[in-house]
């Protein structure tokens, strides 16, 4: 994982500097490319010695764009560069590091909230307000379902974790009873 982060960093930095005037749009297409590049079957296809760089580019660009929303020229150029350099598998990490650079410039941090159950918009807004106050910064929140939590939430903000789930409380009780 650390190796992938090391590989991705120069690409994310270069993309951030090159697209400095249009970070929001760039974030959209780089996330779209990362989602496509995260597919294990696509990576296996791209690693095949029988497949050319142009074929890989055509497949990835074709999946990432459609008639209503074609990839911008900058996205196509970036994708071609990544594929030619054999770094397609690093694209999700490149997107993650690009988002971190973009958020840092805007005074924001990514946060992932794991919940046992789906949350409505009001509950998410309430949680966002509490987490922003707790961590002292603006958060871009993404929600993921994790039924193993039983109840409550687990919030991951950068390298900090706030776990108020039933599962965590049961683990704490178990440790207290064992000790």
From Swiss-Prot:
Pfam families documented for this protein: OSCP
UniProt-recorded Gene Ontology molecular function terms: proton-transporting ATP synthase activity, rotational mechanism
Signal peptide per UniProt: none
Keywords assigned by UniProt, alphabetized: ATP synthesis, Cell inner membrane, Cell membrane, CF(1), Hydrogen ion transport, Ion transport, Membrane, Transport
Keyword Ion transport: yes
Main subcellular location: membrane
Subcellular location: Cell inner membrane
Membrane-topology annotation of the record: Peripheral membrane protein
Matches recorded under InterPro entries: ATP_synth_OSCP/delta_N_sf, ATPase_OSCP/dsu
GO cellular component annotations of the record: plasma membrane; proton-transporting ATP synthase complex
Superkingdom of origin: Bacteria
Family: Belongs to the ATPase delta chain family.
Function: F(1)F(0) ATP synthase produces ATP from ADP in the presence of a proton or sodium gradient. F-type ATPases consist of two structural domains, F(1) containing the extramembraneous catalytic core and F(0) containing the membrane proton channel, linked together by a central stalk and a peripheral stalk. During catalysis, ATP synthesis in the catalytic domain of F(1) is coupled via a rotary mechanism of the central stalk subunits to proton translocation. This protein is part of the stalk that links CF(0) to CF(1). It either transmits conformational changes from CF(0) to CF(1) or is implicated in proton conduction.
Assembly with partners or alone: F-type ATPases have 2 components, F(1) - the catalytic core - and F(0) - the membrane proton channel. F(1) has five subunits: alpha(3), beta(3), gamma(1), delta(1), epsilon(1). F(0) has three main subunits: a(1), b(2) and c(10-14). The alpha and beta chains form an alternating ring which encloses part of the gamma chain. F(1) is attached to F(0) by a central stalk formed by the gamma and epsilon chains, while a peripheral stalk is formed by the delta and b chains.
Record's protein name: ATP synthase subunit delta
Organism: Polaromonas naphthalenivorans (strain CJ2)
Gene designation: atpH
């Amino acid at each position: 994982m650390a190796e992938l982060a090391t590989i991705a960093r120069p690409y994310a930095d270069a993309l951030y500097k090159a697209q400095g005037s249009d970070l929001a749009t760039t974030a959209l297409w780089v996330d779209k490319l990362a989602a496509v590049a995260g597919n294990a079957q696509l990576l296996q296809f791209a690693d095949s010695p029988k497949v050319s760089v142009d074929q890989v580019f055509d497949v990835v660009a074709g999946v990432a764009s459609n008639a209503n929303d074609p990839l911008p020229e900058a996205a196509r150029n970036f994708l071609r560069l990544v594929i030619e350099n054999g770094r397609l598998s690093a694209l999700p990490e490149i997107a993650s590091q690009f988002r971190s650079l973009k958020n840092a410039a805007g005074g924001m941090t990514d946060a992932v909230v794991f919940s046992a159950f789906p949350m409505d918009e009001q509950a998410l807004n309430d949680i966002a307000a509490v987490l922003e106050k707790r961590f002292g910064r603006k958060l871009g929140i993404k929600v993921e379902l994790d039924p193993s939590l039983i109840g409550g939430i687990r919030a991951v903000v950068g390298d900090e974790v706030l776990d108020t789930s039933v599962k965590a409380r049961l683990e704490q009780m178990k440790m207290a009873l064992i000790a």
